[in-house]
């Protein structure tokens, strides 16, 4: 099995200090695009409770096990750092420093390193030292309060909006931008502070603009894109399934109402006072047929209607299947790498890394034979941090990108 692929990040080396949630997902994105990601697992695992062979966020990576609380733990990680482009960590602020692998120690070994920090609350602020999870982060940014019906509690969007959209994706953008700077003439490494609260808030930029212009009410379930509009929402079918409707533009709306058979109610689109009447007409009509029936009715149209599928159903959808949006690897159906590149495509090259399984291989490929030697796992009490590495599903590691270190520490790669 190859260590890296032919994706656009081939040759980029990433050290990921094991965590759960957005940090590992960010590192997976980099690995999917060809980066050589080495995950530093802790003895006993990260505490996610998932069998490592099913943890898809660790695909395309290699793993070594290092006890950072042991006397030589930090030194082993720093040997990897010398040859890395990116480091990702998701501890609470100050923990990496107490473990001896904070930005100061890492940049002393490798000034060009992009040091990515993934947390929920950020590196500073009144809540920086508090525990948290996705739902709390999106709650205080106003994001959670936007989702759901006006007379019901906010709907919980799994952990996709905070952990992965507001966290992982912003971390990846940040470290890639920092890598570009580090590789520019006169550039250097730096710290990327990726906080889920910052990213989740940033996702709402357009909504804030609409609110300032008077086009968005600061309450859920009454606006154009939050379910308040009857032609942008989901409707139950006769078999208990759902169809999603997004017929916003008038020409799409006209096609939608014609195919649904409610042209008489179509003019209600222009009168919000009649929206309850329009919603009732749409709901009643969808309730007369199954999901399969309505899928066939709208197939090939520009009415912007789609069946609401389950996770297991999605891979078999004709469009998903034609594009290869899902792939089979390591006995599991899983999303293929995204986005797609015409010249340097990413791929799923290897299954989820098993803790410590690749130590000898990494020691050879990265030129750090010392990490393959037995570790003294008994920590000296003076070297233990006041509190061990604590991560939540949202306080994860962050990715960093630097240059090729194959010739040794401090050498810049070709620009």
Task: Tell me the role of every PLM-derived stretch.
Residues 1-185, 353-354, 358-375, 401-415:
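N-terminal helix-loop segment corresponding to the beta1-alpha1 unit
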Residues 47-53, 311-357:
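Active-site-adjacent capping/gating segments
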Residues 141, 167-190, 202, 206-214, ...:
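Oxidoreductase and adenylate-handling cofactor-binding alpha/beta cores
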Residues 226, 231-301, 305:
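Aromatic-enriched alpha-helical interface/lid elements that frame and gate functional surfaces
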């Amino acid at each position: 099995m190859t260590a890296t692929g032919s994706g656009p990040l081939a040759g980029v080396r990433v050290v990921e200090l094991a965590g759960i949630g957005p940090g590992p997902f960010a590192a997976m994105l980099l690995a999917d695009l060809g980066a050589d990601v080495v995950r530093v697992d802790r003895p006993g695992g990260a505490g996610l409770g998932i069998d490592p062979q099913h943890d898809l966020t660790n695909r395309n990576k290699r793993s070594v096990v290092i006890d950072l609380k042991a006397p030589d733990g930090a030194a082993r990680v720093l040997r990897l750092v010398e040859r890395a482009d990116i480091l990702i960590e998701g501890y609470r602020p100050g923990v990496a420093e107490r473990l001896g692998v904070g930005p100061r120690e890492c940049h002393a070994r490798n000034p060009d390193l992009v040091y990515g920090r993934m947390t929920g609350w950020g590196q500073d602020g009144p809540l920086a030292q508090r525990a948290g999870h996705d739902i709390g982060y999106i709650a205080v940014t106003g994001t959670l309060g936007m989702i759901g019906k006006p007379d019901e509690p906010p709907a919980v969007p799994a952990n996709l909006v905070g952990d992965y959209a507001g966290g992982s994706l912003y971390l990846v953008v940040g470290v890639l931008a920092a890598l570009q700077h580090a590789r520019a003439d006169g550039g250097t490494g730096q710290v990327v502070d990726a906080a889920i609260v910052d990213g989740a808030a940033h996702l709402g930029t357009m909504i804030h603009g609409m609110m300032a212009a008077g086009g968005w009410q600061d309450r859920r379930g009454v606006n154009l894109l939050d379910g308040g509009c009857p032609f942008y929402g989901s409707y139950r079918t006769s078999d208990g399934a759902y169809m999603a409707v997004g017929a916003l533009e008038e020409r799409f709306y006209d096609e939608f109402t014609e195919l649904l058979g409610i042209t008489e109610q179509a003019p209600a689109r222009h009168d919000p006072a009649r929206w309850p009447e329009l919603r009732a007409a749409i709901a009643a009509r969808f309730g007369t047929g199954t999901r399969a029936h309505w899928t066939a009715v709208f197939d090939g149209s520009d009415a912007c209607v789609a069946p609401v599928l389950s996770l297991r159903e999605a891979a078999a959808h004709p469009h998903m299947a034609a594009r290869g949006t899902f792939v089979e690897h390591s006995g599991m159906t899983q999303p293929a790498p995204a986005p797609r590149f015409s010249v340097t495509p990413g791929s799923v090259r290897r299954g989820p890394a098993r803790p410590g399984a690749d130590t000898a291989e990494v020691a050879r490929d990265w030129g750090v034979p010392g990490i393959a030697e037995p570790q003294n796992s008994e920590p000296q009490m003076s070297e233990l941090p006041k509190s061990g590495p604590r991560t939540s599903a949202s306080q994860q590691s962050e990715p960093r990108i630097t240059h090729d270190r194959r010739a040794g520490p401090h050498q810049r790669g070709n620009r």
